[in-house]
From Swiss-Prot:
GO CC terms in record: CD40 receptor complex; cytoplasm; cytoplasmic side of plasma membrane; cytosol; IkappaB kinase complex; nucleoplasm
Phosphothreonine found at: T23
This protein's name: Inhibitor of nuclear factor kappa-B kinase subunit alpha
Function statement: Serine kinase that plays an essential role in the NF-kappa-B signaling pathway which is activated by multiple stimuli such as inflammatory cytokines, bacterial or viral products, DNA damages or other cellular stresses. Acts as a part of the canonical IKK complex in the conventional pathway of NF-kappa-B activation and phosphorylates inhibitors of NF-kappa-B on serine residues. These modifications allow polyubiquitination of the inhibitors and subsequent degradation by the proteasome.
Protein species of origin: Homo sapiens
The protein's assembly and partners: Component of the I-kappa-B-kinase (IKK) core complex consisting of CHUK, IKBKB and IKBKG; probably four alpha/CHUK-beta/IKBKB dimers are associated with four gamma/IKBKG subunits. The IKK core complex seems to associate with regulatory or adapter proteins to form a IKK-signalosome holo-complex. The IKK complex associates with TERF2IP/RAP1, leading to promote IKK-mediated phosphorylation of RELA/p65. Part of a complex composed of NCOA2, NCOA3, CHUK/IKKA, IKBKB, IKBKG and CREBBP. Part of a 70-90 kDa complex at least consisting of CHUK/IKKA, IKBKB, NFKBIA, RELA, ELP1 and MAP3K14. (Microbial infection) Interacts with InlC of Listeria monocytogenes.
Similarity section: Belongs to the protein kinase superfamily. Ser/Thr protein kinase family. I-kappa-B kinase subfamily.
Keyword tRNA processing: no
Activity regulation as described: Activated when phosphorylated and inactivated when dephosphorylated.
Subcellular location as annotated: Cytoplasm; Nucleus
GO BP terms, alphabetized: anatomical structure morphogenesis; canonical NF-kappaB signal transduction; cellular response to tumor necrosis factor; cellular response to virus; immune response; inflammatory response; innate immune response; negative regulation of NF-kappaB transcription factor activity
Length: 745
């Protein structure tokens, strides 16, 4: 790489010149990189011997650059010591390096032949508008705004535009007017071109011209003519005129509207036209509009801020493949927005499903502003996708976007010969059309992808519920097994002791009813049929994910777009003087692209219908899973209640048994101590058939007393007392020796 004059090989120390970034009227701008630290800076050096006046201008630029500090004005930095030398008696200017190139490079890309995308236009409007406002607030007029003097820098994935080259900038403090200028004529304000006194409004003209070119792909006024020619034809235009073109007849047609095609959303077009009418006013006194007394700034900046602050939601209707846009007033609810969508599309609010690009359904509890991301502008940057929940079959494809008049003209007769200069515009619109078809497919594919992500979210929810259901079913099964075994054991032990212990028909009946309920609840826990349906859906979703139609199928369309771009580039390089050509090859590409789009859209909508059908199956299945889960939980709670109730009854049974044992022990002790004819009458019957229930604990009963009987049995009393004592002792030992350990299991 050629080294700038004055720099000897090796003189830069660790700094190495990597490439020349640009060449201006007096200087070169080169990229320098530090060999060790990976630092990069742009160095502007003088390439010519300068006159005293131009040397002053050069030094003035350095002075201006060093005092500025704004995100949208390129920053000056210190020249590295190893490079800090004078070249042609003027110092070097070191600046931050912006790796994205300049705006001209972006505009020259064939895919931008009909203008930039809306997001790029609005980003440029915001950045450069902010930079110009900053310069003017610091009493600096740039005077040479043009695409070559706007550079792009990627900052955290976002493109930032910066103003460079203040070589022709005018510090207003040095004098309010200036009548000398040597700048770029195509973007020059009329008063500068005519060498008349000027003010800061010259930057408005240049800025408006740039923005118009970014929108349309060409400058606003007879762009194919030299300024000397078009100035005379345009100078008497209406103040609201923002566009002029020459008809085939040679007549100039004026318009207050933006030409088509362009990428601006319909809601942005009108305010943008109003803004351009202020910026492209021929009269410098009226240009930019009056100063707003409240905001203390020209009307053009007020309107610019209004455009940039518009909250616009862009919605792709997947049932019609059409984009609809809505301006969101402050605090509008989502329901209000859905009502507007219903009026526009005919899809009632209850059937609308609005998905973000990540497949998340919009939250009806949040305002409609959730459809708009902060700092993200343009329909090409963010989209919300509208689905009709009442439909699972989306027929598609739909009619392709309409052809412009120019493109339709060559499609009707591809062999017609047109002048090269006219053909360039026609083919530019053809490239825009082909690119548009590809972008239409890409947007619909993003909508399909949102539907797939939504399906996967539903599937994840179904999987979570399935796991919860299986877990609940397994827990119920385990509890039922425990309940069944424990109640069987309880019934067995109860039967063993009831012949000589405690019994209750009412309790026994309740326990048997519990056992029957437990058998019924076992059926509630059977969920195999639901598991089968869920697994079938999982398999279906896996197949949809593997399907080639779930991946982008636009390779052929991209190839056709590139062929159209290559044809257009070849045409641009052909000389335009008195040359003609037909459009046979370009029309072939257009036809093939339409056919390709038709094919991939059929596949896309077929796949989309399967996605939506599968999602509907999940929606239908979820309530069944919820009911099954609810039934299992209810059964689980009932089983636990029955278990608890039975345990309480057992403890009550134990309490009664202990009470009975204590009572009998007390009676036995009394009989052992002293038996008299009077006390013998209180001895209980010894019948083994006597029934003991929970409600009636056996106590000493009154027996028939007879003096005669006492006399007859007095001799046998000692023997009887012994028998009663032994029976009482045996009964107590039997109750205490029962196995009650199951209660603590």
């Amino acid at each position: 790489m050629e080294r700038p004059p004055g720099l000897r090989p090796g003189a830069g120390g660790p700094w190495e010149m990597r490439e020349r970034l640009g060449t201006g009227g007096f200087g070169n701008v080169c990229l320098y990189q530090h060999r060790e630290l990976d630092l990069k800076i742009a160095i502007k050096s003088c390439r010519l011997e300068l006159s005293t006046k131009n040397r002053e201008r050069w030094c003035h630029e350095i002075q201006i650059m060093k005092k500025l500090n704004h995100a949208n004005v390129v920053k000056a930095c210190d020249v590295p010591e190893e490079l800090n030398i004078l070249i042609h008696d003027v110092p070097l200017l070191a600046m931050e390096y912006c790796s994205g190139g300049d705006l001209r490079k972006l505009l020259n890309k064939p895919e931008n032949c009909c203008g930039l995308k809306e997001s790029q236009i609005l980003s440029l409007l915001s950045d450069i508008g902010s930079g110009i406002r900053y310069l003017h607030e610091n009493k600096i007029i740039h005077r040479d705004l043009k695409p070559e003097n706007i550079v792009l820098q990627d900052v955290g994935g976002k493109i930032i535009h910066k103003i460079i080259d203040l070589g022709y900038a005018k510090d207003v403090d040095q004098g309010s007017l200036c009548t000398s200028f040597v700048g770029t004529l195509q973007y020059l304000a009329p008063e500068l071109f005519e060498n008349k006194p000027y003010t800061a409004t010259v930057d408005y003209w240049s800025f408006g011209t740039m923005v118009f070119e970014c929108i349309a792909g060409y400058r606003p006024f007879l762009h194919h003519l030299q300024p000397f020619t078009w100035h005379e034809k345009i100078k008497k235009k209406d103040p609201k005129c923002i566009f002029a073109c020459e008809e085939m007849s040679g007549e100039v047609r004026f318009s207050s509207h933006l030409p088509q095609p362009n990428s601006l959303c319909s809601l942005v077009v009108e305010p943008m036209e109003n803004w351009l009418q202020l910026m492209l006013n021929w009269d410098p006194q009226q240009r930019g509009g009056p100063v707003d007394l409240t905001l203390k700034q020209p009307r053009c900046f007020v309107l610019m801020d209004h455009i940039l602050n518009l909250k616009i939601v862009h919605i792709l209707n997947m049932t019609s493949a059409k984009i609809i846009s809505f301006l969101l007033p402050p605090d509008e609810s989502l329901h209000s927005l859905q009502s507007r969508i219903e009026r526009e599309t005919g899809i009632n609010t209850g059937s609308q499903e609005l998905l973000s690009e990540t497949g998340i359904s919009l939250d009806p509890r949040k305002p409609a502003s959730q459809c708009v991301l902060d700092g993200v502008r343009g329909c090409d940057s963010y989209m919300v996708y509208l689905f009709d929940k009442s439909k699972t079959v989306y027929e598609g494809p739909f009619a392709s976007r309409s052809l412009s008049d120019c493109v339709n003209y060559i499609v009707q007769d591809s062999k017609i010969q047109l002048p090269i200069i006219q053909l360039r515009k026609v083919w530019a619109e053809a490239v825009h059309y082909v690119s548009g078809l590809k972008e239409d497919y890409s947007r619909l594919f993003q909508g399909q992808r949102a539907a797939m992500l939504s399906l996967l979210r539903y599937n994840a929810n179904l999987t979570k519920m399935k796991n919860t259901l299986i877990s609940a079913s397994q827990q119920l099964k385990a509890k039922l097994e425990f309940f069944h075994k424990s109640i069987q054991l309880d019934l067995e032990r109860y039967s063993e002791q009831m012949t000589y212990g405690i019994s209750s028909e009412k309790m026994l009946k309740a326990w048997k009813e519990m056992e029957e309920k437990a058998i019924h609840y076992a059926e509630v826990g059977v969920i195999g049929y639901l598991e089968d349906q869920i697994m079938s859906l999982h398999a279906e979703i896996m197949e949809l994910q593997k399907s080639p139609y779930g991946r982008r199928q636009g390779d052929l369309m991209e190839s056709l777009e590139q062929r159209a771009i290559d044809l257009y580039k070849q045409l641009k390089h052909r000389p335009s003087d008195h040359s003609y050509s037909d459009s046979t090859e370009m029309v072939k590409i257009i036809v093939h692209t339409v056919q390709s789009q038709d094919r991939v859209l059929k596949e896309l909508f077929g796949h989309l219908s399967k996605l939506l059908g599968c999602k509907q199956k999940i929606i239908d299945l979820l309530p069944k899973v919820e009911v099954a889960l609810s039934n299992i939980k209810e059964a689980d709670n009932t089983v636990m209640f029955m278990q608890g109730k039975r345990q309480k009854e057992i403890w009550h049974l134990l309490k009664i048994a202990c009470t009975q044992s204590s009572a009998r022990s007390l009676v036995g002790s009394s009989l052992e101590g002293a038996v008299t004819p009077q006390t013998s009458a209180w001895l209980p019957p010894t019948s083994a058939e006597h029934d003991h229930s929970l409600s009636c604990v056996v106590t000493p009963q009154d027996g028939e007393t007879s003096a005669q009987m006492i006399e007859e049995n007095l001799n046998c009393l000692g023997h009887l007392s012994t028998i009663i004592h032994e029976a009482n002792e045996e009964q107590g030992n039997s109750m205490m020796n029962l196995d009650w350990s199951w209660l603590t299991e």
